[in-house]
Amino acid sequence: EAYNKDNNIYVRDVAEDKEYVLSRDGIKDFYYSGEMAWSPDSKKLAVIKVRDIPERRIPLIESSPVSQKQPILQWRDYAKPGDVLPVYLPALFNIEQKQQIPLDTRFFENQFYLQLTGWREDSRAFMFEFNQRGHQRYIVAEVDAETGGIRSLIDEQSPTFVYYNRNFRYDLEDGKEILWISERDGWRHLYLIDGN
């Protein structure tokens, strides 16, 4: 069992009912989130570490509310163009050795969002998808579970816009091949990508 406590990652050996700390560097504004994925062999754990930002509140006025005649002032958290965004970094832990496997964080610069998308069936790697700020680059990558090395599987780039919310990916034979939808030539096509 793995969980976030005091901004860090802990695991509990259910059989022995013992708690172990895996990370010690999590703080309030740079913490390990609850977004995590166990490797199928339960020997590794992938987690997202988040560098948070302060709220940026803007006022909104509901001019004609149904409930009353007077306008209602509301506040919303809203990032404006150019504002600093949260940073999401993947982290990898070896459960047996109770230590973190370092990853090269330069790969994740200038990001809009990053999300874990699962592990390979044989536990050799976990995948994530990375959307660069500006939405002109979208990367599907895998992280080697032993070395922490990062390999780009798909690097979708466009001078205008990558439709990140309409993407489709399906891994065949545990990632040996990948079905991927892209508009890289101006038309929406299904591509078969070599995952090796």
Question: What feature does the model see in each segment?
Answer:
Residues 7, 51, 132, 184-185:
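Residue-level signature of beta-propeller blades and closely related beta-rich strand-turn architectures
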Residues 14-17, 94-98, 144-148, 194-196:
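Short loop/turn segments that connect beta-strands within beta-propeller blades
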Residues 18-20, 99-103, 138, 151:
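Short beta-strand segments
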Residues 6, 15-19, 42:
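Extended, regular secondary-structure scaffolds
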Residues 22-37, 47-103:
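Predominantly five- to eight-bladed beta-propeller fold
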Residues 3, 12-15, 48, 55-61, ...:
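Short, solvent-exposed loop/turn and secondary-structure capping segments
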